[in-house]
Design a protein with these regions (language model features):
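Conserved GNAT acetyl-CoA-binding A-motif
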Residues: 80-91
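Conserved beta-strand in the GNAT
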Residues: 39-47
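Conserved active-site alpha-helix within GNAT-family acetyltransferase domains
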Residues: 94-111
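A short helix-loop-beta-strand connector motif used in the catalytic cores of GNAT acetyltransferases and
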Residues: 21-33, 54
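C-terminal "cap" of GNAT-fold acetyltransferases
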Residues: 116-138
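Conserved acetyl-CoA binding element of GNAT-fold acetyltransferases
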Residues: 50-62
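Conserved catalytic-core motifs of GNAT/GCN5-like acyltransferases
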Residues: 90, 108-123
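Short amphipathic alpha-helix that is part of the acyltransferase structural core
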Residues: 1-22
Length: 138
């Protein structure tokens, strides 16, 4: 059975880094994930906090219903606990399936950085708290 991993940020972050090819240190970050049978199958790292914005990095190896509470926990942390005004995702244009997935979960295209990624443009995506379907409505 899949379960949330909310309090082992180093383990989740190491797995996400491997999955997304992150070679650099995350800096100040928080991470949450989903594991099944002791193996990570999904994770989100949030870093580059500046008080209003942070960057989200998402890795999913296997889809499960536990992805829903993961996104709820991530958005609750970002928007309710950290009081961020936005979450930012950056995806190279040569990864159209990732852009489509991010839009499916609620990110919107904000702009495209010409030559912002090695060999590609960089899509800058944003999730706004007032449009976030993962937040529980009061």
């Amino acid at each position: 059975m899949a379960q949330l991993v909310l309090f082992d940020k180093a383990r989740v972050a190491a797995w996400v880094a491997q999955e997304v090819g992150q070679g650099a240190d995350w800096g100040s970050y928080y991470a949450m994930g989903v594991e099944r049978d002791g193996q990570m199958i999904a994770g989100v790292v949030i870093n580059n906090f500046n008080g209003a914005n942070a960057t989200a990095h998402i890795a999913i190896k296997r889809f499960t219903k536990a992805i829903i509470p993961l996104f709820q926990a991530v958005c609750d942390y970002a928007f309710n606990q950290c009081k961020l005004k936005r979450l930012t995702g950056m995806v190279p244009s040569n990864e159209p399936h990732i852009i489509a997935f991010d839009k499916h979960i609620g990110f919107e295209e904000e702009f495209i950085m010409k030559d912002g990624a090695p060999g590609a443009d960089m899509h800058v995506l944003v999730m706004w708290p007032d449009k976030c379907r993962w937040l529980r409505k009061e």
